Amino acid sequence: GSVPRSAGAFMPMGKAEPADGGYLVDGRWSFASGIRHSHWLSAGSIVVKDGKTTDEYIRVVFPTSEAVIHDNWDVAGLKGTGSCDFSVSDLFVPQGFSYPRAAAEPKRGGPLYRLGWPGFVAYEHSAFALGVGRRALDTIVGEAGAKIRGTQPSRLASRPSFQKSVGECDLRLRAARALVIQLLKEAWEQANHGIIPGPQLQGEMRSSATFATSVALDVVLEAVFRTGIR
């Protein structure tokens, strides 16, 4: 059958109080991308005992239909992610639908679900960021042949400073993409052998995603600087 679609928030913004056979969960979480397309939600929660918070951090899983979805994703960009808040109040979650953050082991789903955290999402963020950067660069290159800026009669594409900028941006995007792919290949090979990538590779994947996002942002800002907002 099909893979159930899930969404959620890893941040421990909820409270889970032990109850007979499970937990009573309260909380409101943000940035639940894709929530309106999901069947299940996973929510980070702090365990509360005798009215006091503990240092125990778990994730609870429950049907999306059990949560209130708050229509508060009113943004200028990324509208398509639909990253609305969601909340629950005194929701009973069975013990079997909770798991500790640090010791979670994939039970099914193949190598994709053995990539681990944060590697599992790092490559998704990288792909989006690099795509935005590449689109910005391709757009200004496509317009440069006809664009004239300021009082100079020459086309933007013929100016050495513009050519240098485009070349540097292109190389930086390629380098960031190559690094992301290299690390993902290493992680994927381990996952295919039943191994969850360890802390070093997880850190490298996260760092590569941060680096790719930084490069993409630089490219977009350079595109605006070189061509203007129109």
Regions found by a protein language model. Give the residues of each.
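Charged/polar positions within long, soluble alpha-helices
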Residues: 138, 142-145, 178-181, 185-188, ...
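A beta-strand-loop signature enriched in Asp, Gly, Thr, and Trp
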Residues: 147-206
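Buried hydrophobic positions in well-ordered alpha/beta secondary-structure cores of metabolic enzymes
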Residues: 25-27, 88, 133, 176, ...
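Alpha-helix capping/hinge segments and adjacent helical runs
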Residues: 207-230
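Short Gly/Thr-rich strand-loop-strand
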Residues: 10-15, 71-77
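DPxDG-like acidic metal-binding loop motif
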Residues: 28-67
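Glycine-rich flavin
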Residues: 1-38, 52
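Glycine-rich beta->alpha junctions and the first turn(s) of the following alpha-helix
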Residues: 76-173
